[in-house]
Amino acid sequence: MFQTLMNKDRSHIGKILFLGTFFLPVSSYAQYAWQEGAEAGKLDLGKDIHYEVEMQGSFSNDKTPLWLNANKYGLSSLEKNNGYLRGSVIRPLATDSAHRWGVGYGVDVAVPVNYTSHVVIQQAFMEARWLHGVLSIGSKQYPMELKNQTLSSGSQTLGINARPVPQVRLALPEYWTIPILHHWLHLKGHIAYGVMTDEKWQHDFTQRNSKYTDGLLYHSKAGFLKIGNEDVFFPLSLEMGLEMAVEFGGKPYRYVNGELVQIPTTGGLKGMWDAFIPGGEDATDGMYGNVAGNTLGSWMFRVNYDADTWALHFYGDHFFEDHSQLFFLDYDGYGEGDNWMGHTKRRYYRYKLKDIMLGTEVNIKYGTWLRNIVLEYLYTKYQSGPYNHDHTMNIPDHLAGMDGYYNHGIYPGWQHWGQVMGNPLYRSPIYNKNNQLYVYDNRFIAYHLGVDGSPSEHFDYRVLGTYQKGWGTYDAPFYKPHHNVSFLVEGAYKFKHNWKVRGAYAMDFGSEEMLGHNAGFQLTVSKSGLFKL
């Protein structure tokens, strides 16, 4: 939701973001890597095919509690009693790590009860690797960057809270070492285009009585730079980068003067280019030129200290919805009177860096009862301030505040199938009883703690606890601040022959404006293994 952006400013942003795409993440897992020097052998596409069958049931007194519902790639439900039977067949790229070429594929399907769908195709993808580059086509669950996958509250831009978006994705998924500077610099990144799949769900949820979008298109890109050298004894490293995403094109509908109206948009190659290098404008922008679509992203960093028996990490995730928090500057040198659209002064307004997610992670490498600890702090109240004013003939001052995180005037906001696509502490639209595709709590302060351990070879556990204080949104503020506390206690036991049973209990304690009072239990039974062809 980029605020007013003049052509001069837009060109600067475009150049910077275009250069940034050359420092483009997906996952830091070795499943993608080509192991140079390994013995190759013959490529066998029927080798190392993994299967998993899983059955899950959730039982609650009201809605499913937050941490039984969130960060499950959208495979969850708020209904008090729900469940699914799930089966997957996946051949990972790691199978071909000794080859210059690699091939991976997978299908992951769930048949749920009391979900938003009768059948969920959670994953269906094919991917090919040449050396270090990977081309993927289809729906796939991609992990978060620079955060613990099971203990963090979630990433603010490219999270794991919503269903995967079918896409074509070109990636350098693992850090590639630049063959100069003595192996101290490493790069990874991705570019992707896709299509949202929740069109019918939007129709059902809104009953077409409020805004929705058909055929909504998706674009994401990211790039990370790592400074460090694992070949020498130097335990300190720094990772930093940028994630960006855009919702664009499609057929947005909203009510204007009581009538349902389709808003014209730009799709095709022009729309894809405007999403790649933010440009164009929405039909509703008028004389104040914005960029087309719903554009958002995060500046991210992570400092790592890796010792022999322990590791310490400190990370940050700064979210933005427009240039006011992307660059913290806004041009504010417009003229007056007949020259009110002219750039007459070298004057800029500087925004503060207040909204941020900060986290610390401790890994005890040989720990049993205590293995990993994550502590996070989130602040999202500022959003460039409580004022938004486009310059006029009489008042030349320009302020681009009230950013409205995860919401958008035309599009349904940063959500997919009702779940926000970033951090689940932003209250997802699926909670709304008024059938609006709107995030009603995006201004909050939160503290989050996660710990896990493996007391024995067969048993492991996880505990999450979150405190949140919310102010609603700038457009729809709460009449007073509201609070919520959520926690989860989970244990899993591994039996012989790759059988696993996992039980979890969770509760929410909060006002109805937040999550309400919920308590629930979740039981999951799974069996995994390899097909022997």
Regions from the language model: what does each represent?
Residues 55-63, 91-93, 107-113, 130-132, ...:
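Transmembrane beta-strands of outer-membrane beta-barrel pores
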Residues 98-128, 142-161:
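Surface-exposed loop and membrane-interface regions of Gram-negative outer-membrane beta-barrel proteins
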Residues 236-242, 252-533:
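Exposed, low-structure sequence patches enriched in small/polar residues
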